[in-house]
Amino acid sequence: MTTNPGTDNPPVDRPLTAAAATRYQQLRGHLAALRLHTAAEQLPAVLDQAASEGLSVTAALERLLALEVDATEARRLAGRLRFACLPTPASLEDFDFDAAAGLDRQLVAELGTCRYLESATNVILIGPPGVGKTHIAVGLARASAHAGYRTYFTTAADLAARCHRAAIEGRWATTMRFYAGPTLLAIDELGYLPLPAEAASALFQVVSQRYLKTSIVLTTNRGVGAWGEILGDTTVAAAMLDRLLHRSVVINLDGDSYRLRDHHARNEQLRRTTTGTRQPIH
């Protein structure tokens, strides 16, 4: 039996009566009307399989609908990933734990299950530049999207700029609802630059709206004791820390910079390629 899944033709190993052909076209029409487009496209192939494998009507229907469900979930995942705005393809699976001094692999693996989202627990990643904070944050955000959760990734500077524009344009409430919406909000690079007072206030309001409701993953290169300096207001810093740390996992990362390790590795490879010898990298 042969088919052409991309056409409207029914299976053609034997002639169909006019009534059977009509029912076949009606079935495809019903599937299309219900927006089950993958099922409509795959119907000829599944009917062929049902005939060749002797599938029952129930088994054939289950196979057809399973294809539709898989396609629907793939589209939804693609949409969640587009919305998430992840800056890199990083995942938890490709993180170099051997280079991250003292990082608890089991803890990161547990966070990768996304169970922490069920209790609106926050994750705070602290460490100097280049040790993998953003990689883990992106990995957690990617895992969240794959688990079916609405996820959004931004930087502290971008969040502040967006809130500033919203205040000027009269869209403050709408913007606050936007940041309150995702199950996981990842905020990268807090502390690289001091925030002006209005930006610190915006960040505090975002944290307050999500408090005990939804999770935040936050990366920073400054210890919590320096947040008063980052935010320009020790009172705001204390209030925000109180909300973030109330239900949280704090991960301190140390070790050599990822970017420096990559730079050294590229230099070493270049030397081997051009000279055939290995020389120490300084």
Q: Residue locations for each model-derived region?
A:
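Conserved P-loop
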Residues: 103-181, 281
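AAA+ P-loop ATPase motor domain of ring mechanoenzymes
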Residues: 62-115, 119-122, 261-270
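Walker B motif beta-strand of ABC-family P-loop ATPases
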Residues: 184
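Interdomain "pre-motor" coupling segment immediately N-terminal to P-loop NTPase/helicase cores
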Residues: 28-88
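Intrinsically disordered, low-complexity and often Lys/Arg-enriched segments
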Residues: 1-29, 267-282
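Solvent-exposed alpha-helical segments within well-ordered globular domains of core cellular machineries
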Residues: 25, 29-32, 41-45, 59-63, ...
